[in-house]
Amino acid sequence: MADETKKEQIGSVILDLSRYSGEDLYCDGEVEDRILEIAKNYPEEEFDAIIRDSKDWPTLYHLSSIRGNIVGWIPFDGSEKVLEIGAGPGAITGVLTERCGSVDCVDLSRKRSLINAYRHRNCSNLTIHVGNFEDIEPELDRDYDYVFLIGVLEYAGSYLHSSDPFGQELRTILSHVKPGGRVVIAIENRIGLKYWAGCAEDHSGRYFGGIESYSAKEEPAKTFTRPALERLLLENGVREYAFYYPYPDYKFTSVLFSDRRLPEAGELNENIRNFDRDRLLLFDEKKAYQGITQDGLYPLFANSFEVVVGPALPVDYCKFSNDRAPEYRIRTEMDLVGGKVRKYPQTKAAGEHVLRMAESAMALSARYAVSSTGEGHPKLPEMGGKPSEKSGETEETVAAAKPRTLNIAPCTLTKDGGVEFPYVGGRSLESLLDESLQAGDGERFLSLLNEYRIRVGQGSLQQISDYDMTFSNLLIQGDLWTAIDCEWAVPRSIPVEELLFRSLLVYYLEDGKRSERCEELIGNERLLKAVGIPEKDAQRLAREEQDFQKHVTGGVVSLGEFRAQMGTQVIKPAQLQTEEEKNAAKELLKQEHEEKQELNSIQVYYDTGRGFSEEESYWVGEQYQEEGLVTFTVTVPEEAQRLRVDPAICPCVVLIRNARINEAEQKAVRRLVRVNGRHYTNGSIVYTTMDPSMEWDLKKLRRKAGIPEGEDFDLELTLQMAGLPSTMAQAMEDRR
């Protein structure tokens, strides 16, 4: 029985400390203090901006709403009683409290539990138990609908005293699930493809740590291959389970695949996601996935697993549109058994956007129904391509395929605030185009574009168009073409040439190799002619696409862009680099050196009574040398009233090593300097600004040096400077 005197209440959340030892044995240190302050003082709606400004791994990992995707696809009905083991700062908890009836959390750390409590303080259905799971477990209920172990099972050996910690964990958890309930486990794959390609093992930070079967004596966690995880389930009495594959991994899921809906190679292009540390690049994962998916090996090499123990769920695939403005964030689910595709808003603001799809589908269906009768469709000019000999097409077979219509997948509203489409089989136009490029069949590629132009262009006099009629949104079965997404329909007629050009542009942007292959096989000039877009219009349409993407994203930085901003490196060994890559690396080093030289340049300003200005300034020719030392001389004109020296164009630490006026050492130079940084007792000046400066009142300096007014003089300075990383400078500024 829990001690009622050892409970705290934060808002509506109960914090049960009756089994807390009084010490947090697991902590990220000072960063958790900062995250706790964020949870106390900022609403979740502001977390994205805080993450963007912080540019550090712990803030991203603990506060990103994308973390919740790993459970966000589960079809809760709102009545569920759930248990979350290892809840930490609550990255997953928010989704559970919002969509379930009651939530019990367990975590070892009081500080992390406080973060969880403060960020969800308005949730009256949340109780957090703080302490070791072994101590808390006997008092937990045994009728949960769901128990979640998200990134937890691999640590069982560190918090369970057992010769079989993983089996013991599973058996214990199963005893707390009611009949018909489920256990959900998310965990890394010990031999996930990213580890072969050069990512360090997630927990130990060692390269190939998991691949080498955790040969090191001290490993903080141990993950499993798919066969080993299945064996663990079977050995502990589990017979009903399903494997899902979060991509790129379970931490930041953008797509969820399953054994009933495995990925195609073209869907696996988010592979550079090393937020927390540098990685090697030993091969191109996307290319490796081509053979892996074709040979049915993806379940063995997926980076993560999500296992649902218990009755099957009616979801076989889920895609999250994360990198968007809140009003456009949605998820798309497939139920292959039920033959349904559903779309749901991920935010309250996106509700209207989703509901609008049903109306758009009706309008588009009406357009193409009219076009199938031949009405409202002007004759299109011929394309630049001919029927493909390699594909076996002839003028006669193409003509025999008419009428060449476009089917619009019907869309209906659901009772739970989403929309529903019938599942449509077939192959995407995108995959058929890829197949043509891989086969070296440029004529077939052009023939498919021609077919797009004919079918999508029908009914063009109607005032409705689907702006996002991209190749991936068109599914083909024999002669039946079906558009499966009407999310971005607009109430106006868009020329089919512009829709085709945009689709081709999106196709290229998703994989740069496609444009290179098209140039080799077809040539850009012929391709643009075939699409029907002049060069000047192509430039305009490319700008319009950029504007559209800015509108959709609303300034949200994608995870790929954010990783680049964080500064973690992707290192390709020299032996694996092509000559082109080596030359590019040399050019980059040269550019970085020039930029560094520019940042370390010294600028001198004089104030002759009109204030400091660029007109009365110059760049010092001398550069910082070994140990960051430089000596230079400033000739101060007689009319100058003030002097300013900018030692760099970046945050830095500066020390005035020596100062001489007219060849005589002058200590007054150090005493009289005014800076926009901070003086330290050792004489150094720390600047956290990008525009550091040192300034002297020349009237005072002349008087101290015994130089008459109206006389010029030489000031020789020896400075020592070390640049500061912007993140370090910001941290120092925050502590002032």
Residue ranges and their predicted role:
Residues 184-207:
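Conserved class I S-adenosyl-L-methionine
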Residues 218-243:
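Short alpha-helix
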Residues 319-361:
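ATP-binding glycine-rich loop module of kinase domains
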Residues 89-100:
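Conserved SAM-binding loop of SAM-dependent methyltransferases across substrates and taxa
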Residues 214, 463-516:
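Catalytic activation segment of kinase domains across protein kinase-like and atypical kinase folds
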Residues 1-42:
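N-terminal auxiliary segments of SAM/dcSAM-dependent transferases
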Residues 164-182:
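A short glycine-rich, Lys/Arg-flanked "PGG" loop and its adjoining helix->strand segment in the class I
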Residues 407-449:
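Conserved structural core of kinase catalytic domains
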